[in-house]
């Protein structure tokens, strides 16, 4: 049977990258919101009402996406830490 080796520092780095991507998405969302605000003032009547509904959906989707990236990052980090702790405990049993 072959031995499975994990690169825990790289895995934790990946979790950090994922958290950074969430920040990037949030920043891009803020930039897009500025552009959308300019459009909002130009749309009146039925078009404005339709725009408001679309904007609410967009805002919710952006929040959900950022929240999902944060959740994936923290889950990946927690699982990596748990695996590393388990590996350390098992290695200690064998004098490693």
Swiss-Prot record:
It holds the Pfam family WXG100. Zn(2+) binds at residues 14, 70, 76-77. Keywords: Metal-binding, Secreted, Virulence, Zinc. InterPro entries: ESAT-6-like_sf, T7SS_ESAT-6-like. Changing residue 70 to R: No change in activity. Contains a number of strongly recognized T-cell epitopes distributed throughout the protein sequence and induces high level of IFN-gamma, indicating this might be a good vaccine candidate. A fusion protein (p846) of 3 well-defined antigens (EspC, EsxH and Rv2660c) induces robust specific T-cell immune response and could be an effective vaccine. GO terms for molecular function: metal ion binding. Belongs to the WXG100 family. ESAT-6 subfamily. This is ESAT-6-like protein EsxH. It comes from Mycobacterium tuberculosis (strain ATCC 25618 / H37Rv).
């Amino acid at each position: 049977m072959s031995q499975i080796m994990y690169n825990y520092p790289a895995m934790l780095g990946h979790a950090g990258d994922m958290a950074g991507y969430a920040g990037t998405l949030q920043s891009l969302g803020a930039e897009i919101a500025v552009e959308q605000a300019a459009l909002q003032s130009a749309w009146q009547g039925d078009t404005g009402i339709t725009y408001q509904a679309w904007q609410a959906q967009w805002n919710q989707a952006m929040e959900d996406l950022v929240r999902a990236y944060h959740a994936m990052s923290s889950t990946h980090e927690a699982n990596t830490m748990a695996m590393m702790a388990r590996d350390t405990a098992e290695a200690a049993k064998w004098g490693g």
